[in-house]
């Protein structure tokens, strides 16, 4: 066991678990980034609930959310580290692992602060349905990310995390990698999004786009893009950022480092010593419905058609109002 606060020792052990020959593309890195992302991406600025504090995925209500399918692998990879360094909280370990993995895979150095606490029970968990649904369009992206406090530029920058990893049909329903080198952080995601001729995938699964990788043989695995990825180049306000990041790797790395650091601080309330206070976090009270789920039919509700989330946005407005009214009485 390391000394209390010896984060260098924790980082060293995180680096040691990244190589996983039997796992996706031989690396645990991408799934650790996804764990940090999903642990943080439940934040709602309107109700001031959710976020990276608490490590709620330890409980079924959050860990069993279909949007978090497959993240049990990331948690299993990190469990020996938690056992060895028992003083670190899960909330800190999960976010630190994402930051360490990004840099180890060639990405930028990202600011990370310790001090998050773990929930003692599941009473403060955010509702399901707050994470992005890859089958949607630009309106859904804004609905989800604006709720957390992100603008269009930050949405496009955070989408660059799709430089890493792959989709699995038994988890998200989608299948395939976004880029040629899914364990190397780069701006290739944006370049391929603009360069390749993306076509609807012919299969029985949810609607997604596929294209032949540059230099690939006909029988090689195809690259893929989600409807939310393709929406970035269809939307007139988001596309310029895709073009900028495709052209300027350094600009992307710089912006990604800033926005990922912002993401993993969402919902963290620190006292003067820097320790996050779980007792300052608010409980969500009220109903929250998720956006439409995946559809195999292009253009159908749930397949990425603009405007589809508007009715659900109105429902959530009412839910937010109810939640704020309840919180005002606390």
UniProtKB/Swiss-Prot annotation:
It is an enzyme of class 1 (oxidoreductase). Coiled coil: none annotated. Its cofactor is heme b. Binds 1 heme b (iron(II)-protoporphyrin IX) group per subunit. PROSITE patterns: PEROXIDASE_2, PEROXIDASE_4. Pfam families: peroxidase. Keywords: Heme, Iron, Metal-binding, Oxidoreductase, Peroxidase. Heme b binds at residue 162. Residues 286-330 are annotated as: Disordered. Its EC number is 1.11.1.-. The keyword Ubl conjugation does not apply. GO terms for biological process: cellular response to oxidative stress; hydrogen peroxide catabolic process; response to reactive oxygen species. The record marks 34 as: Transition state stabilizer. Destroys radicals which are normally produced within the cells and which are toxic to biological systems. This is Putative heme-binding peroxidase. It comes from Mycosarcoma maydis (Corn smut fungus). The lineage of its organism: Eukaryota, Fungi, Dikarya, Basidiomycota, Ustilaginomycotina. The gene is CCP2.
